[in-house]
């Protein structure tokens, strides 16, 4: 287990419209059984609930690390489509010999063109999808673009959220809370920004895992302190 270090604080008048009620709605944590770590022991690994089969894994922002994608596709006997339009060489190299991982040299966003995809082709074709994303802020336009029906086709998802500061970004997390329960939260210690809203401290970068509401049978608030034993630092620095 590691020490949780409070980073530097940032205050700004733009944040004043973010209320306690909104934070509670977005960050209330629910209890899920069978939490496991998939992927590396540090950055690149994620905590998910082991709840069964999936149609497909959609992964965004892989860079040179597919430890999560490899472990996930092997465990659940499924295929992965992995997207990264920034680290094309590294992404192509790590995926080229993987029979279960198809690499696509596009970024994820809210449009479809030769450089971006909004994943709607997949989100409207499958209804038991796992989504994993670390796309450096691109998660906000992508999630904003989704319909509620498209969100409901995602069985489980894990996102790294980057600098959820102003009200518009919190409204996107509120949107997720309409269809999914938050079952894990982990602050990324590779960034030392923290936001303060009326004496509630929120890290600038954090990972969230969500389960579709119809897939969580016992709706109970989490009673385990964070971080969990299977959590780890993103970086040792």
Residue ranges of model-derived segments:
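Rossmann-like AdoMet/SAM-dependent catalytic core
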Residues: 2-51, 65, 115-128, 163-237
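SAM cofactor-binding core of SAM-dependent methyltransferases
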Residues: 32-114
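Beta-strand cores of modular interaction/reader domains in eukaryotic scaffold and signaling proteins
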Residues: 58, 81, 132, 158-160, ...
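Active-site segment flanking the S-adenosylmethionine/decSAM binding pocket
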Residues: 62, 108-173
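A short acidic (Asp/Glu
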Residues: 68-71, 91-94, 141-146, 169-170, ...
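Residues that flank catalytic or metal-binding motifs in active/ligand-binding sites
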Residues: 76, 99, 153, 204-206
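A short helix->loop->beta-strand "cap" motif at the edges of active sites that frequently abuts
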Residues: 76-78, 154-155, 179-180
């Amino acid at each position: 287990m590691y020490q949780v270090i409070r980073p530097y604080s940032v205050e700004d008048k733009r944040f004043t419209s973010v209320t306690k009620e909104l934070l509670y709605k977005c960050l209330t944590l629910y209890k899920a059984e069978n939490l496991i770590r998939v992927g590396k022991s540090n950055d690149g690994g994620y905590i998910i609930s082991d709840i069964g089969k999936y149609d497909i894994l959609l992964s965004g922002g892989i860079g040179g690390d597919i430890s999560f994608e490899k472990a996930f596709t092997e465990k659940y006997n499924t295929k992965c489509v992995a997207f990264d339009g920034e680290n094309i060489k590294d992404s192509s190299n790590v995926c080229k010999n993987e029979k279960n991982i198809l690499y696509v040299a596009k970024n994820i966003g809210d449009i479809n063109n030769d450089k971006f995809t909004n994943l709607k082709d997949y989100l409207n074709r499958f209804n038991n999808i796992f989504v994993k994303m670390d796309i450096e802020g691109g998660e906000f336009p992508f999630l904003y673009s989704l319909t509620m029906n498209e969100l409901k086709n995602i069985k489980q998802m894990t996102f790294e959220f980057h600098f959820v500061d102003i009200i518009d970004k919190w409204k996107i997390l509120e949107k997720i809370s309409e269809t999914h329960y938050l079952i894990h939260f982990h602050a990324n210690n590779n960034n030392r920004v923290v936001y303060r809203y009326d004496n509630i401290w929120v890290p600038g970068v954090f990972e969230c895992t969500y389960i579709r509401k119809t897939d969580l049978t016992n709706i109970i608030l989490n009673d385990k302190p964070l971080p969990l034993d299977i959590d780890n630092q993103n970086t040792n620095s």
